[in-house]
Amino acid sequence: IDLAEAEEAVRRAVDLAEQRAQVQIESVLVSTSAGRIASELLAASINISHASVSDNDITRVLAAGSRRAVRPGRVVLHSLPIRFTLDDARGIRDPRGMVGHRFGVDIHVATTDTAVARNLMLVVESCHLDVEAMVASPYVAGLSALADDEADLGAALIDMGAGTTTIAVFSGGRFVHAEGFAIGGSHVTMDLARGLSTTVYDAERIKTFYGSVLGGGIDERDMITVPPLGTDDREPPQYVSRATLLRIIRPRVEEILEMVRDRLAASPFAAEPRARVILTGGASQLAGVAELATRILRRPVRVARPLGVSGLPDSAKGPAFAVAAGLLVYPQVANLEYSEPGRARHLMTGTGGYAARLGQWLRESF
């Protein structure tokens, strides 16, 4: 990755946003799908200082759990309590005011590589912006794309991005697992570019308009035009069948979904036999992906659009916008996380004039 190009891209995006929304942007939320996102479920317990559980006790036990998550080369993205315990009682959602002696917590900690996080911070701060929080992409995609019942009953959010595929598992209304791997939709594009001897730009266009992972109804005689590679205008275009595209695209998508299946089998999702899978991200829009995923994962699957943000224009309601929409939802749930003293997240709730102007800009700009 070229950090200078990344910085220029951030500057252009921020400049455009400031012009359209008529606000000066001083701080941002940053989502990441890189850095080998991983999860740990940790337990910690303390003796409570008074007869009943206080806010201070909750802070102390969360701090004890988060300290156990510190690993060389890793940085914490999220630290979320899953359930509390008090003496022999388990599964407590809100322990404040309850009477007991030994107070514990099961906490989910999501981390990423420190080097990746530092480079992202460097790019953003080089644009004279403060980073309010760095969040895991599949988590915020889930915030915008999952229905409440799905998060409560159990679901896996699979964000099929360009360079990565990331996973977030939800159960009991809680975010309980995250991970990812560095294969995504851009790998399908590169397979097409090589297989068809065409440019990456044309391969992406062909994938978007003609790509599919299911063979039903595809005729070998159904041909499409493929521009040649190179700058010689005299070279005639080639013609390939849509069945040829299928033979190039499907193996890579199968590989991605099989890796997802294996990761889910080793995650808390395996304990939820009736839980469903929700797909987001640009690569999830390939024709037939939901059907193929149902076969490979053996779970109910749907391709999701952002649900958690009202007022989005039609062009920003697709699966590819789930992460972006989730960043608008995240400030409303950020207070559920544990933050180290001095690093508390003071995020806008999305209820003021800024959010209204942002929504107006989105509607007017697309």
Region locations from a protein language model:
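Glycine-rich phosphate-binding loops at beta-strand->alpha-helix junctions
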Residues: S33, T112, G211-G215, E272-I296
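Short, solvent-exposed amphipathic alpha-helical segments in soluble enzyme
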Residues: A151, G172, A265, L292-R298
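Catalytic phosphate/nucleotide-handling subdomain of diverse soluble enzymes
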Residues: V289-G318, Q332
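Hydrophobic multi-pass inner-membrane translocation pores used for secretion
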Residues: E272-A275, R305, G318, A324
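Nucleotide/phosphate-binding catalytic cleft detector across ATP-hydrolyzing
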Residues: I1-L157, R174-F175, G185, T198-L246, ...
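Hydrophobic, well-ordered secondary-structure elements that form the walls
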Residues: V260, L279, L327
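A short acidic Gly-Thr/Ser loop motif
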Residues: S33, L157-T164, F170-G173, A182-S186, ...
